[in-house]
A protein has these predicted regions:
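Membrane-interface extramembranous regions
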Residues: 1-136
Length: 136
């Protein structure tokens, strides 16, 4: 049984991840700029690849039947894109302070998001089956 709280968290997270995936295609230049340029083959490739991943992971989180795999996939995705957050923080070091706050704020926020995805995953665990019947 899933608690109502973690059900809501999963649906909200899934919706936000899906919207982020859409934005990778609607405004790819923004995402290109935060991809570390040393990653082959190109920034646009990684923008689209992470957008596709988000478009897959988001709905997996929303649908209760696929939520466990969605939560694990979300954790993997959030860990995989963390280098882009680090690069963004470094790359934005000369930007106005309000933009730097956004870049620095993403670093600890990513840990919170991973923790939330983990909590969604653990909320979906099947309770252990108790066998109170005596042995034959």
């Amino acid at each position: 049984m899933v608690s109502a709280r973690w059900n809501r968290v999963a649906v909200v997270m899934g919706t936000l991840v899906t919207l982020a995936g859409v934005m990778h295609f609607a405004n790819p230049t923004f995402f290109d700029d935060i991809v570390p340029p040393w990653l082959p083959p190109s920034e646009r490739f990684w923008t689209y690849a992470s957008g596709v991943a988000e478009l897959i992971v988001g709905p997996l989180l929303i649908v209760e039947r696929t939520r466990r795999i969605g939560a694990v996939s979300a954790i993997a995705l959030f860990v995989a894109v963390y280098p882009a957050n680090l690069y963004m923080t470094w790359d934005w070091r000369d930007r106005p302070w309000n933009e730097q706050i956004v870049a620095y704020g993403r670093l600890p926020l990513q840990f919170v998001i991973v923790w939330l995805a983990w909590k969604v995953f653990t909320s979906m665990r099947t309770p252990a089956v108790r066998n109170d019947r005596p042995a034959r």
